[in-house]
Amino acid sequence: MEKLDKRREEETYLWIPVQFLDQALIAVLKCIGLLCQPAKKTAPSPVTFNQPEEQEEDYGVALKDDDVVVLLRDNKAKSKKRDKEKPSSGRPGQTNSVPNAAIQVYKED
C-alpha cells in the first residue's frame, strides 16, 4: 500500500513539468487558431407553457431574398470639442511677470 502511494506521488511529481508544457502549448495553439476543441453539447432546457416566447431583437440586420442587408443607425454620442490649452509664456518654476510696455499702457488710460 505504501509503495503504491509513493509511486503515485512520484508520477505526479514527474508530470508537473510536462503538464505545464502541455497547458502552454494548448494556450498558444488556441491563440493562433489552430486548436478548435469540439463544442460540448448540452441538453435543451425544458420549456414550460407559462414561459413567454423570446423575442428577437433587431440589431440593424435585414434579410431580403437570401441576401443580408446591414442597416446602420447613428446612435453614437458626439463629444464636445475643446479649445487647446495655451501654454504659459513663462519658464517652468518661475512666476510670470508683466512686461514694462504693458504697465505703461494701463497707466495712460
Curated annotation (Swiss-Prot):
Q: Residue numbers for the site described as Required for ligand-receptor interaction? A: G90
Q: Does the keyword Phosphoprotein apply?
A: no
Which parts of the sequence are annotated with region: Disordered? 74-109
Any single GO BP term: innate immune response
UniProt keywords (A-Z) are: Plant defense
Basic and acidic residues compositional bias: what residue ranges? 74-88
Q: What are the TM regions of this chain, as residue ranges?
A: none
- Tell me which InterPro entries the record gives: PEP (IPR035176)
Prosegment location in residue numbers: 1-73
Q: Tell me the function of this protein.
A: Elicitor of plant defense.
Query: Which family is this sequence assigned to?
Result: Belongs to the brassicaceae elicitor peptide family.
Q: What is this protein called?
A: Elicitor peptide 2
Lineage of the native species?
Eukaryota, Viridiplantae, Streptophyta, Embryophyta, Tracheophyta
The gene name reads: PEP2
